[in-house]
Every structure is written in structure tokens, then in C-alpha cells.
Amino acid sequence: MLEGLKIKYGVIFNHKKVARIMKKYNLKPEYIRRIRPNYSAKTIAENVQPNLVKRQFKTKGLNQIWCTDITYLIFGNKRAYLSTIIDLYDRHVVAYQISKRNDIKLVIDTLNKALEKEKDVYGLILHSDQGFQYTSNEYKVICASKGISISMSRKGTPIDDSPMESWHGILKKETLYNNNITSLGHYIQLVEEWVAFYNSTRLKNRNLN
């Protein structure tokens, strides 16, 4: 487990701490696979967490509630996936990651980016849907090690994560649908520019209003 976290995600934890976390959440180690894990319905059900947010999308400060989700990106005959984390306090983008694969690594890389930027996250609620990435042992171990509480939308209820759904819709409208994208690298550049504009300019203007 330790070696798998280190190799795949660049995360290093003391083995005793990981053992305590896994015991607390009744987690069992998994083999690293090169394909998408085929979690059983029982495993997913055991790892699903309650909805702590309950559509209360307003907070009193930063790093109280983050929302996260994955959306697909289609341009030409190509497909990619965007994983994003936003802070519900002011809706700024904490971190994002684009990949050709919709896998656990995509979510873990996004989370690690966010944790590199924001160190004071103890007590934070991280809300998502019930996707296999968010019910994975790797995701639960990292969140638990940082004192982050996992919250999940009810199955088949995207409105429970509507701020994230809305943000992805806006990004697609203003990047994916308005440009002649020729490659994944081209699209990543567009997203980088748009997120920088969104965080620095659009949010500032919105908050002034």
C-alpha cells in the first residue's frame, strides 16, 4: 500500500499512520492494476459516505467545503477527462487536472495539487459523487490523513453537487465550444488561460457585484 501510494501518486506516509487509518475505516489493501479497478457493488456500497453538505452551498470562510467532480471533454474524435476542485466560499478553482484516462490517478493528482496549495485543511469537507475514484481506498486514506471529511451526493442526484456541475458547464461553453481545438495540449493551454482569468478577474467582478 505504501509503495503503491508512493509510486503512483508521489505520496509518502508513515506505515503506522496508514495502518491506523485503514483499521479505522476497515480498509483492505488492493493490488495496483493497470486497468480501471472493477470494484464490486458491495465494495462501493461499503465505501460510500453520507451527504454532509445537503445542498447547503454557502460557507463562512475558505477551506470549509470543497466540491469536486470529473467531466468528459470531446473535441474532434478525441476524448479526455477534467477533474476539478472548487472552494464553495467564493467558487475559486483550488486545483484541476486533465488526463486521457478517467482513473483513480486523475483524482489523486488533483487532490494532491490542492493539498500542495492549501495546507490548513483539517476539518474540511470534500464533496463528490459516488464515482469509483472517490470510493477508492487511496482517496479515503489521503483524506483521512489530512483530517478531511468525505461527503458524497446521493446516487443519481447530480443536483447534490450542482455548483461543480455548473462550473464545468461554464468552462466547456467558454473553451470547448468556442475554439477549433486541434490537440489535447492545445486544450490544456486554453483551460490554463481560462482558469487564470476566472480566478483573478471573473470572480473578483462577481464578488464586487
Regions found by a protein language model. Name each.
Residues 195-209:
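Charged, gly/pro-enriched flexible loop segments at helix/strand junctions
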Residues 59-94, 100-101:
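An active-site-proximal beta-strand-loop segment
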Residues 39-42, 128-130, 136-137, 150-172, ...:
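RNase H-like two-metal-ion nuclease catalytic core shared by retroviral integrases
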Residues 90-96, 151-153, 177-178:
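Short small-residue beta-strand/loop micro-motif enriched in glycine and branched aliphatics
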Residues 1, 18, 22, 53, ...:
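Mobile genetic element proteins and their domesticated derivatives, centered on retroelements
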Residues 1-61, 157:
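Basic, flexible linker segments flanking DNA-binding modules
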Residues 176-184:
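Short, polar/flexible loop-turn hinges at active-site or ligand-entry regions and domain interfaces
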Residues 78, 97-119, 125, 135:
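Active-site beta-loop-alpha junctions of metal-dependent nucleic acid enzymes
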